[in-house]
């Protein structure tokens, strides 16, 4: 019974997921490791709804890392962050990219230009350019759509 955590060999979460105590310990260790990878190990026992927004971004990435992906898809990881947190996120993405492939969907062009080595630029659902950062940043279609005509 899920509510009977004192007499069972598994806790509420592990019981609901059908995990043994050993599996629960392994899963917790993977979660701790993922939090360490995003420099958030100190928040492991805190409620997610009590964390500042930039830290919740780290927790979201850590949740994805628990599954030990070969490809990590990050959807606007810098969205809603201030300049200092964006700088930190750039560093984190660089670090993660040494451990797995990263696909980044992002509108902050400074983030894109600093962390990507190959770009596919879409405008209204159409690929308007692809290639390395230098080539794409000079493409007139990209400049007009995203970087501004004055660049």
Question: What kind of region is each of these model predictions?
Answer:
Residues 112-114:
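A short, surface-exposed alpha-helical micro-motif characterized by mixed small hydrophobic
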Residues 72-76:
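Catalytic Walker B motif of ABC-type/P-loop ATPase nucleotide-binding domains
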Residues 68:
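Conserved catalytic motifs of ABC-family nucleotide-binding domains
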Residues 130-131:
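ABC ATPase "signature
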Residues 1, 8-43:
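Conserved ABC ATPase "signature" region
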Residues 86-98:
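Helical segment within the ABC ATPase nucleotide-binding domain
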